[in-house]
Curated annotation (Swiss-Prot):
The lineage of its organism: Eukaryota, Viridiplantae, Streptophyta, Embryophyta, Tracheophyta. This is Nudix hydrolase 24, chloroplastic. Its main location: plastid. Keywords: Chloroplast, Hydrolase, Magnesium, Manganese, Metal-binding, Plastid, Transit peptide. It comes from Arabidopsis thaliana (Mouse-ear cress). GO terms for cellular component: chloroplast. The gene is NUDT24. Expressed in leaves.
Length: 365
């Protein structure tokens, strides 16, 4: 069977209407009459945002062409490189000191970054020998802590020390099931080495025994990873919302998936990573979901954060992950996990166990 993209791509409205259909690459399917035509996939113009200047969907297609061969050990090398990209700088752990709240470690702060916090000695307190950072003991209520730290982050944000303020609060807690001690601006979380949580949904379609993944291309207006490839649905877990509630919310906002359909998503585990980049220490746990979608499903972005979508054979997605840097880094981990669970990465491949282990390099607590 010839493989190709079943796609939704942006086309300027001056050239095509929002419902214009033009033929593109061919593939065969014996799917029901509700699915796309049997011998041709189509491009549907649904956006007007231009593609990223760094790469186009044509570049993605060119790098996906060669069929993925699980027995080829070089394939796992490419996957291992993507895992390593999410787990950089761990030899620099000694440059960080604990951030402690109520005698529990909630994060880690780089010694170099503490110079900015020392200017706010009515909010941040340092131990006698600088071994850890905590908050002023007078700040003993979550709301008071949230307001006080928000004041500091606003000042540091205005100075460009903490860029990309999102006005989205994340909980500060030592582990997932622990109560939150307070909340903090999402953009500041890596500067305090806080644990972060997110949901990632592998939205897939199955035809004639072959699986296809819906892939999104991030808007160029995104403050992080603009223009990169992403999951159909993915999003951080903010304060005051459960994982399931966030799943439903993100499904609707990012892909126009109804609650009825989102409720079919199956929780399949987690991946985790720890990454150090100068003053930032990212410690994230990603809740992974598989969602089998109807063959005639077409995603529609609702929040302006996605530029375009493509439906791509999983074997070709594997090649893009292995051979390129087109995907947002953390997405590669979730896709590699999907490849394990759906049999595209097999025990016969050298490095199989090492790759599997390293998908959970972070603290899954």
């Amino acid at each position: 069977m010839a493989s190709a993209f079943c796609s939704l791509c942006p086309t300027p409205t001056s050239l095509f209407s929002s419902h214009a259909l033009i033929p593109t690459l061919q593939w065969r399917s014996s799917s029901s009459s509700r699915s796309p035509p049997l011998h041709i996939s189509r491009v549907l113009s649904v956006e007007t945002v231009p593609l990223s200047p760094s790469f186009t969907w044509n570049d993605v297609f060119e790098n996906s062409r060669k069929e993925y061969v699980p027995q080829n050990s070089s394939d796992l090398t490419g996957f291992l490189e993507k895992v390593d990209r999410c787990n950089r700088g761990l030899e620099k752990l000694g440059e960080f000191i604990p951030f402690v709240i109520e005698e529990q470690i909630v994060g880690y702060i780089h010694k170099g970054f503490t110079k900015y916090l020392r200017d706010f000695n009515d909010i941040f307190t340092f131990s006698q020998y600088g071994g850890h950072v905590t908050l002023n003991m007078m700040l003993d209520k979550p709301e008071e802590r949230t307001r006080a730290v928000a004041h500091v982050i606003k000042i540091l944000g205005n100075k460009g020390i903490i860029p990309g303020i999102r006005n989205e609060l994340y909980p500060v807690k030592p582990s997932f099931n622990a109560p939150a001690f307070f909340s903090i601006e999402r953009a500041a979380a890596p500067y305090f080495g806080l644990k972060g949580y997110a949901i990632h949904v592998n939205g897939y379609v199955e035809r004639d025994g072959q699986k296809f993944l819906w892939i999104g291309k991030r808007s160029l207006a995104k403050s992080t990873y603009p223009g990169k490839l992403d999951h159909l649905v993915a999003g951080g877990l903010p304060h005051g919302i459960s994982v399931c509630e966030n799943l439903v919310k993100e499904c609707e906002e990012e892909a126009g998936i109804s609650k009825v359909l989102a409720d079919r998503a199956i929780a399949v585990g987690v991946v985790s990573y720890m990454d150090i980049d100068r003053y930032c220490f990212t410690r994230d746990v990603l809740f992974c979901y598989d969602l089998e979608l109807p063959q005639d499903f077409v995603p529609t972005n609702q929040d302006g954060e996605v530029d375009s979508f493509r439906l791509i054979p999983v074997a070709q997605v594997a090649n893009v992950v292995r051979k390129t840097s087109f995907f947002k880094d953390s997405c590669s981990l979730v896709i590699i996990d999907f490849l394990f669970r759906h049999g595209l990465i097999r025990p016969e491949s050298p490095g199989y166990l090492d790759l599997y282990r390293r998908l959970r390099n972070g603290d899954c607590s």
